[in-house]
């Protein structure tokens, strides 16, 4: 198959899935809630979308946050600072609430970065008083940090890191070096559910997603970004390096591919999503109607994909750790392993492209 001639095959427009922005709420100045529904879907499509979105939202949506504070003022019993009204715990929580902005792509793979708060009382220390690295700004300059009640200096060295909802910043920080800050994650909560329904004598499924985000990220923006991350990654999978090929008995073909320069989280959920998509390969070529029983179970006599084996290998490059994902795909004639990989990746791109409509919906609002 010539890759230059390979294209997405969109299903029947009459039955093609569409999404609805069901609900949106804002809570104070910190959080936003959104609820979405996508239908009609097959059982396999809804499971694939559910898995992929959950992983992408929690691992691929990034934000800049303060993760560590080294306070030069003397602390009393690790609870209070002389001359400051707020407790140490309250001050650290206030740092964790500060929203930092910048062009995130410029900070990926770099850092941690250092910021300095150096003020003298009496005054109310705010986010605007922090000296930040170039390219990083605070979203709300008046965000409160601490009330300094006496004429004393208040000096804090802050660590800034690019974090996801599953990362906790750098580890190995002792109490002598400062205090860890628990930052507000970009995605605070993701729930999803699948409901079946009948229409026109056929069984379909509806995927419902609800999400709580930390501002300035809003739910439909997170859904758009997460889907784009998945699509960009599977564009790379489409171009995976073909390492080996062999033919076995009974029309079995085995192909080995390699996808490089991945993070650990990316390797894991590429494997999970791709496995589901590979076992969907070939269904659209089947002659005759599919019954529910055939559609809901994997029949080795029907599907052209017989097996998927994955292996992950870590390596160092320019001081950073990356992973290579090796994919061994077993197919049955006439489907070739590379054709199966391309068709599965194309199916993933087709499904997640549905959420690119979220940007248009946002413009309407």
Curated annotation (Swiss-Prot):
It catalyses: RNA(n) + a ribonucleoside 5'-triphosphate = RNA(n+1) + diphosphate. GO terms for cellular component: chloroplast; DNA-directed RNA polymerase complex; mitochondrion. Its main location: plastid. Its EC number is 2.7.7.6. One of its GO terms (molecular function) is DNA-directed RNA polymerase activity. Belongs to the RNA polymerase alpha chain family. In plastids the minimal PEP RNA polymerase catalytic core is composed of four subunits: alpha, beta, beta', and beta''. When a (nuclear-encoded) sigma factor is associated with the core the holoenzyme is formed, which can initiate transcription. DNA-dependent RNA polymerase catalyzes the transcription of DNA into RNA using the four ribonucleoside triphosphates as substrates. This is Putative DNA-directed RNA polymerase subunit alpha-like 3. It comes from Pelargonium hortorum. The lineage of its organism: Eukaryota, Viridiplantae, Streptophyta, Embryophyta, Tracheophyta. The gene is rpoAL3-A.
């Amino acid at each position: 198959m010539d890759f230059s001639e390979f294209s997405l095959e969109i299903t029947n427009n009459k039955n093609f899935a569409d999404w609805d922005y069901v609900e949106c709420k804002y809570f104070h100045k910190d959080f936003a809630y959104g609820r979405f529904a996508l239908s009609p879907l097959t059982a396999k499509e809804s499971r694939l979308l559910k898995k992929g979105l959950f992983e992408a939202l929690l691992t691929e949506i990034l934000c800049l946050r303060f993760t560590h504070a080294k306070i030069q003022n003397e602390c009393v019993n690790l609870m209070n600072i002389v001359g400051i009204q707020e407790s140490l715990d309250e001050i650290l929580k206030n740092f964790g609430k500060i929203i930092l902005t910048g062009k995130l792509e410029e900070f990926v793979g770099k850092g941690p970065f250092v910021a300095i708060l150096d003020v003298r009382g009496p005054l109310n220390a705010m986010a605007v008083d922090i000296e930040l690295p170039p390219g990083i700004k605070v979203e709300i300059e008046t965000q409160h940090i601490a009330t300094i009640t006496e004429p004393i200096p208040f000096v804090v060295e802050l660590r800034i890191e690019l974090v996801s909802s599953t990362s906790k910043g750098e580890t190995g920080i002792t109490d002598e070096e400062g205090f860890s800050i628990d930052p507000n994650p970009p995605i605070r909560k993701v729930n999803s559910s699948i409901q079946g329904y009948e229409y026109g004598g056929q069984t379909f499924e509806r995927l419902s997603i609800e999400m709580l985000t930390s501002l300035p990220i809003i739910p439909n923006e997170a859904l758009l970004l997460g889907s784009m991350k998945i699509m960009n990654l599977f564009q790379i999978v489409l171009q995976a390096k073909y390492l080996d090929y062999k033919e076995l008995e009974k029309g079995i073909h085995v192909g080995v591919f390699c996808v490089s320069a991945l993070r650990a989280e990316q390797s894991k959920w590429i494997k999970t999503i791709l496995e589901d998509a590979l076992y969907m390969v070939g269904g659209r070529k089947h002659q005759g109607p599919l019954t529910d029983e055939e559609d809901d179970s994997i029949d080795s006599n029907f599907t052209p994909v017989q097996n998927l084996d994955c292996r992950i290998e870590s390596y160092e490059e320019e001081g950073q750790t990356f992973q290579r994902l090796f994919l061994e795909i077993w197919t049955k004639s006439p489907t070739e392993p590379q054709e199966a990989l391309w068709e599965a990746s194309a199916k993933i791109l087709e499904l997640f492209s549905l959420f690119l409509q979220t940007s248009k919906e946002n413009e309407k609002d």
